[in-house]
Amino acid sequence: MASPNKKQHTNSDTWLIVGLGNPGDKYANTRHNVGRMVIGELLDRQVPAASLNTHKKTNTDIAEVKIAGRKVVLAQPRTFMNVSGGPVQQLAAFFKIPAENIIVAYDDLEGDPGAVKLRQSGGDKGHNGLKSITKSLGTKDYWRLSCGIGRPPGRMDPAAYVLKPFPKSEAAEVAIMCADAADEVERTLGVGN
């Protein structure tokens, strides 16, 4: 750990974009994996399309890409959602990325279905993945990219709801939401400016 009197060297030109979710095919198309879907959209936009590779030191799948001329690390932790903080902190340390250059895409139960909102800093809104990241980074000063999935119907348990796959009838809406989220990342990094 760095001495409080010494400023840690950071690479402020590099950004870390993290897509939260759970690993494995069982969870691939669930509401809880929307963050991972956003990373997939960003990968597909690379020319040629980029792919993830395992970064063994951090137990994370990553791709190093350029967006708007900036070096960007796209990442999907290989851990379950609730313990995402460790890999995110390790990646930030490995690449020397400050918290203010980290964007975390996640599923938002409180957000209207399909709504995308980017905000810097703030609370975790009860999201265990964000809680883990805040605890591991020791700060709230990272960006949150919420992807609205809405509340569960009736009395359905929210934990069961987020682990259900999106129905085929919502596929187009999910694709649009992921595209909107990727657009928001690109705007933040300077695409179109």
From Swiss-Prot:
Q: What is the lineage of its organism?
A: Bacteria, Bacillati, Actinomycetota, Actinomycetes, Mycobacteriales
Q: Whom does it interact with, and what assembly results?
A: Monomer.
| Name used for this protein in its record | Peptidyl-tRNA hydrolase 1
Q: What is its EC number?
A: 3.1.1.29
Which residues participate directly in catalysis?
32 (proton acceptor)
Give the family, as the similarity comment puts it: Belongs to the PTH family.
Q: Which SUPFAM superfamilies match?
A: Peptidyl-tRNA hydrolase-like (SSF53178)
According to its UniProt record, what is one Pfam family this protein matches?
Answer: Pept_tRNA_hydro
